[in-house]
């Protein structure tokens, strides 16, 4: 219990950039934000178009206490907090859930949206929590992408 408590305490004051991608598990990002905030972390969210099919920016904003970023080409977002600044301002980047599609983007360096561009621009530790159907998980393409990312 003490070891778990010290791990949670390690998040106090840390800035976590949470990337929420498309998949039914996106709703779990809401609980993750709550737990990170409870541990004392600051949370800023990037929501992909697919992620927005499952959770709303308002829900993420209400729990994180910060604006939600989603559009790579928004003049407002770029002037306030571009993809470079989003990646620099974080101590840790977490992709949860990480859909099969987003894992492929990460593995192949595709930068066609804000979330993928942020990941290419970051030099911070990045954690991905894959979430998909078991057949998608077992597919050779997904396994190859995971091997590339490891």
What is each residue range found by the language model?
Residues 1-128, 133-150:
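A cross-family phosphate/adenosyl-ligand binding-site feature
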């Amino acid at each position: 219990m003490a070891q778990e408590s010290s791990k949670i305490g390690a998040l106090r004051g840390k800035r976590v950039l949470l990337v929420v991608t498309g998949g039914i598990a996106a709703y779990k990002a809401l609980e993750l934000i709550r737990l990170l905030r409870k541990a004392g972390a600051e949370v800023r969210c990037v929501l992909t178009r697919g992620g927005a099919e499952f959770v709303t920016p308002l829900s993420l904003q209400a729990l994180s206490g910060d604006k939600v970023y989603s559009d790579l080409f928004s003049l407002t977002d770029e002037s306030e907090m571009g993809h470079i600044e989003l990646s620099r301002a974080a101590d840790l980047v977490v992709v949860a859930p990480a859909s099969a599609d987003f894992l492929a983007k990460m593995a192949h360096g595709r930068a066609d949206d804000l979330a993928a561009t942020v990941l290419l621009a970051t030099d911070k530790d990045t954690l991905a929590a894959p979430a998909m159907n078991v057949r998608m998980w077992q597919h050779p393409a997904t396994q190859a992408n995971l091997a590339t990312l490891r």
